[in-house]
Swiss-Prot record:
SUPFAM superfamilies: Nucleotidyltransferase, PAP/Archaeal CCA-adding enzyme, C-terminal domain, PAP/OAS1 substrate-binding domain. The record marks F139, K144, H313, N314, R386, K391, E487 as: Interaction with RNA. GO terms for biological process: co-transcriptional mRNA 3'-end processing, cleavage and polyadenylation pathway; nuclear mRNA surveillance of meiosis-specific transcripts; single-species biofilm formation on inanimate substrate. It catalyses: RNA(n) + ATP = RNA(n)-3'-adenine ribonucleotide + diphosphate. It is an enzyme of class 2 (transferase). This is Poly(A) polymerase PAPa. Gene3D superfamilies: 1.10.1410.10, Beta Polymerase, domain 2 (3.30.460.10), Poly(A) polymerase predicted RNA binding domain (3.30.70.590). The C.albicans mating-type-like (MTL) locus contains, in addition to the genes for the regulatory proteins (MTLA1, MTLA2, MTLALPHA1 and MTLALPHA2), a and alpha idiomorphs of a phosphatidylinositol kinase (PIKA and PIKALPHA), a poly(A) polymerase (PAPA and PAPALPHA) and an oxysterol binding protein-like protein (OBPA and OBPALPHA).
Length: 555
């Protein structure tokens, strides 16, 4: 029995698992395996081999830069350089096809420019490299690579120390001194994941429970920080807290308690894995007593590593309602699973987002240019979607503005600008599906320049918000969302690289029965509108609820 104290409060129960709970746990692991949650031993060994190569390359990178900066041969060999992992790989919850979040840590004489020049060239010289995409201007500068069949996100941090030996750990807060904000953000990922693993009583129990909750959150479409839902680190911390409260429980019990505890949680009381610490930096630490912005956080989940921050600051009124509703569904299903009425597969059933609402807003970001340029623009629009959600929540008549957590992309080569505009105007609807039949797909071009000469290249990304309306007020006819849409357009057009000749943004209202086919997956039958019989119009017709959201202007 594990009697060590974990967390900011005593445990709720230190009871060991019962035979029935162990049986339930076995069936959970079996379900996760059947859904491909675990990677093969061979694939995992390959990851380790690739990380060993990257470690050697990091040392070679630091050596080359050191020599270039007139450091002696002996010292250049000794200054080191080390890689750290973070995210799902470090937490031990990765699956087939998962990427590896990797941090390259270097001594003080190696710069970020060196990373994007010298290390970049070293990577390009490797036969294992399949793809490489440097993004030096990102919030956390990154080099994305496909290396020996594995996707890897490489970020960089320079420490204010002369050597980075292989046995260096990042738990000493003093290592954060005299570094810039980008370095601090880069180091934070590894420091947070390392602390989470140190703060759970039984790491294996935590990992299996997290695999389940992560899969549940993805299946139920409540996973994604950028869209106003918890991201991977936040879900990990939420699971870790339950592990602290039930230190001797098996993973199946952790999952059950997860839903019960968080559906009754006194939000906005924060979820903490340890007391918030002070440190040596003049940086802001999460503190709702001091900062008004921190008081606005609806479901705060606080990172354990200094400087502590809220990992769920993007949650809105609507996304909180959606999350709490999913917690309640989880409770009901766990009750049935416990008595054998339901199975784990019912808990992990796919969401019904594209069946749930009568009205949807389809936000279209379009670029008449290359796919690479479109990715930058559409990424910016995605990052701003939650701001539109927040503005819609203030509109009278909107009870819920529910963002979907994935985008859909398509590219076409159009005959002319008029055809491109027509396709754009219908994109996201069933009519749009019909319109593009026979139009050359940009992704299927195979770089055949003869096929696309004099064509207009068009790339589009669509995002969806489901609207739950309450138009019960007497005489309420229309929902006016012109103002929040206009504000959103202005935000997008305020992007520093916005070009009105190339970049376009639209918001259109689409009814359930008019959604495009690609939002449904194999096995789902899209809703079909049943034609109603015509009837006589009564004199009270004007008092009934409206049948549409009204027209939304496009920009």
């Amino acid at each position: 029995m594990n009697n060590q104290a974990y967390g900011v409060t005593p445990p709720i129960s230190v009871a060991n698992s019962t035979p029935k709970e162990n049986e339930l746990n076995d069936s959970l692991i079996k379900e996760l395996k059947s859904r491909g949650s675990f990677e093969s031993e061979t694939a995992t060994k390959k990851r380790v081999e690739v990380l060993n190569i990257l470690q050697s390359m990091t040392e070679e990178f630091v050596y080359k830069v050191s020599i270039k900066k007139n450091i002696s041969e002996g010292m250049a060999r000794d200054v080191g350089g080390k890689i750290f992992t973070f995210g799902s790989y470090r937490l031990g919850v990765y699956g087939p096809g998962s990427d590896i979040d990797t941090l390259v840590v270097v001594p003080k004489h190696v710069s970020r420019n060196d990373f994007f020049e010298v290390f970049y060239e070293l990577l390009k010289g490797r036969s294992e490299l399949e793809e490489i995409a440097p993004v030096p201007d990102a919030f956390v500068p990154i080099i994305k690579i496909e290396f020996a069949g594995i996707s890897i996100d490489l970020i960089f941090a320079r420490l204010d120390i002369p050597r980075v030996p292989r046995d260096l750990t990042l738990d000493d807060k003093n290592l954060l001194k005299n570094i810039d904000e980008k370095d601090l953000r880069a180091l934070n990922g590894t420091r947070v994941t390392d602390e989470i693993l140190q703060l759970v009583p039984k790491p294996t129990v935590f990992k299996h429970a997290l695999r389940c909750i992560k899969m549940w959150a993805q299946q139920r479409a409540v996973y994604g920080n950028i869209f106003g839902f918890p991201g991977g680190v936040a879900w990990a911390m939420l699971v870790a807290r339950i592990c602290q409260l039930y230190p001797n429980a098996v993973s199946a019990v952790i999952v059950e308690k997860f839903f019960h505890i968080y559906s009754q949680w006194a939000w906005p009381q924060p979820v903490l894995l340890k007391q918030i610490e002070d440190g040596p930096l003049q940086v802001r630490v999460w503190n709702p007593r001091l900062y008004a912005l921190d008081r606005q956080h609806r479901m705060p989940v606080i990172t354990p590593a200094y400087p502590s921050m809220c990992a769920t600051h993007n949650i809105t009124s609507s996304t909180q309602k959606v999350i709490l509703s999913e917690f309640q569904r989880g409770i009901e299903l766990m009750n049935d699973i416990n008595v054998g009425k339901k199975s784990w597969s019912d808990l992990l059933e796919r969401h019904d987002f594209f069946f749930r609402y009568k009205f949807y807003l389809c936000i279209v970001a379009a670029t008449r240019s290359t796919y690479a340029e479109h990715l930058k623009y559409s990424g910016m629009v995605e990052s701003k979607l939650r701001l539109l959600v927040q503005k819609l929540e203030l509109v009278e008549g909107i009870e819920l503005a529910h963002p979907y957590v994935k985008s859909f992309e398509n590219g076409y080569y159009c005959d002319n600008a008029e055809e491109a505009h027509e396709i754009m105007n219908l994109y996201g609807t069933s009519k749009g599906d019909d319109r593009v039949k026979g139009v050359l797909h940009a992704e299927n071009n195979d770089n055949n320049k003869e096929n696309v000469e004099n064509k207009v290249e068009l790339h589009m990304t669509k995002l969806f918000i489901g609207l739950k309306l309450d138009l019960s007020k007497e005489g309420e006819k229309k929902l006016d969302i012109q103002y929040p849409c206009a504000e959103f357009f202005n935000i997008c057009k305020g992007w520093q690289d916005f070009d009105s000749e190339k970049h376009f943004i639209q918001i259109k209202n689409v009814k359930l029965y008019d959604l495009s086919d690609d939002v449904y997956v194999d096995g789902e039958t899209r809703p079909i509108k049943i034609a109603k019989r015509k009837r006589a119009v009564s004199k009270n017709e004007g008092k009934k609820k409206p049948k549409s959201v009204g027209t939304v202007s496009a920009a």
